[in-house]
């Protein structure tokens, strides 16, 4: 579980205090598989316990992992259920986890945002386990293998259409308060990402780096406008790499500029740069990182993502003038 905390020195009028509930590998939830009515009750009780703890800690927003890597945690007509729910790929858990999470969040006065991993599709073993239900089988043209993993290809025009189809399912059918994109970037250390054909076909004279950045921007723009056309009140956020001094490994690097441009172009509601750190020593350097990560754009706050296990289990580690729980 990761948490989101405001970094302003003075508390804003409307403060977001959010936590990521991670389903991949069962890191946060679920720990129980639903193979019986009792399993359903236990799995739901585990989530309720997490939500109760977050409510008691004064959180007001939950980012519930809804899509992992080519599989999902809601009843979808496009991608299969994640095996973490039942122990079987595509296994119906007997209830709709996303609908349940939304209802329980709203009971506690908390917002629920659907957290969707976008570009990565998992390693070869994972993709093979999904079989014919994998997007790599259904939509081969938009998928590429790279370094023993599979990815959606941001440079293919149909990629944004595919991602939008997933988002549309969620926004139209569920009372979500927001859509949150994770891993909306090219893979790390990927100068040879296999998109040369698409680059030649679609670049229109742009450099490779600029073309790749534009591909990601176009995905965000397309989905943001689609969401707002369906439900204008639903927030759209994304999680760029938070290591602002160490982004050379990413072909789409330059997230601070991307965020500022995205906000000014009105294609993103909230930027959530990720730290992904949980060492005690990181607590000392966190205020420095926070103060230099980016300057908030006009009309928006500045937020960052922390590791919730560290924060909730040892809150004194992250106590300081920049963070409050």
For each feature predicted by the language model, list its residue ranges:
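Catalytic domains of carbohydrate-active enzymes, especially glycoside hydrolases
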Residues: 42-71, 173-178, 251-258, 315-321
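Substrate-binding cleft of secreted/luminal carbohydrate-active enzymes
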Residues: 54, 61, 254-271, 281-325
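Aromatic- and acid-rich polysaccharide-binding/catalytic face
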Residues: 177, 182, 197-205, 248-267
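Active-site-adjacent "subsite" loops/lids of carbohydrate-active enzymes
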Residues: 14-16, 22-45, 103, 114, ...
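Aromatic- and acidic-residue-enriched segments that line the glycan-binding/catalytic groove
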Residues: 72-87, 120-146, 184-204
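Aromatic-lined carbohydrate-binding/catalytic grooves of carbohydrate-active enzymes
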Residues: 57-93
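Aromatic- and glycine-enriched glycan-recognition loops and surfaces
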Residues: 36-57, 84-108, 214-222
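Aromatic-lined carbohydrate-recognition surfaces of secreted/lumenal glycan-active proteins
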Residues: 102, 106, 111-123, 180-187, ...
């Amino acid at each position: 579980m990761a948490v989101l905390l405001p970094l302003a020195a003075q508390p804003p009028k409307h403060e977001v205090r959010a936590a990521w509930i991670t389903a991949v590998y069962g890191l946060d939830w679920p720990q129980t598989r639903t193979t019986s009515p009792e399993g359903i009750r236990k799995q739901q009780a585990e989530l309720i316990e997490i939500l109760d703890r977050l409510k008691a800690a004064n959180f007001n927003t939950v980012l519930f992992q809804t899509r992992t890597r080519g599989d999902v945690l809601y009843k979808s007509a496009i991608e299969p259920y994640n095996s973490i729910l039942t122990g079987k790929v595509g296994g119906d858990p007997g209830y709709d986890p996303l609908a349940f999470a939304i209802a329980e969040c709203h009971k506690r006065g908390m917002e629920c945002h659907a957290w969707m991993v976008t570009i990565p599709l998992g390693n070869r073993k994972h993709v093979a386990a999904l079989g014919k239900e994998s997007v790599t089988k259904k939509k081969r043209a938009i998928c590429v293998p790279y370094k023993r993993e599979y990815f959606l290809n941001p440079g293919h025009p149909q990629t944004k259409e595919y991602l939008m189809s997933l988002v549309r399912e969620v926004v139209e059918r569920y009372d979500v308060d927001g859509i949150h994109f994770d891993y909306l970037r090219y893979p790390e250390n990927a100068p040879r990402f296999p998109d040369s054909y698409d680059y030649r076909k679609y670049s229109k004279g742009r450099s490779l780096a600029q073309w790749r950045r534009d591909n990601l921007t176009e995905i965000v723009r397309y989905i943001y406008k689609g969401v707002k056309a369906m439900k204008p009140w639903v927030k759209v956020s994304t999680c760029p790499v938070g290591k602002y001094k160490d982004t050379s490994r990413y072909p789409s690097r330059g997230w601070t500029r991307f965020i500022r441009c995205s906000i000014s172009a009105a294609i993103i509601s909230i930027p959530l740069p990720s730290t992904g750190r949980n060492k005690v020593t990181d607590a000392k350097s966190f205020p420095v990182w926070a103060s230099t990560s980016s300057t908030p754009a006009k009309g928006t706050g500045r937020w960052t993502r922390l590791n919730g296990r560290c924060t909730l289990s040892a809150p004194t580690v992250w106590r300081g003038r920049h963070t409050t729980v």
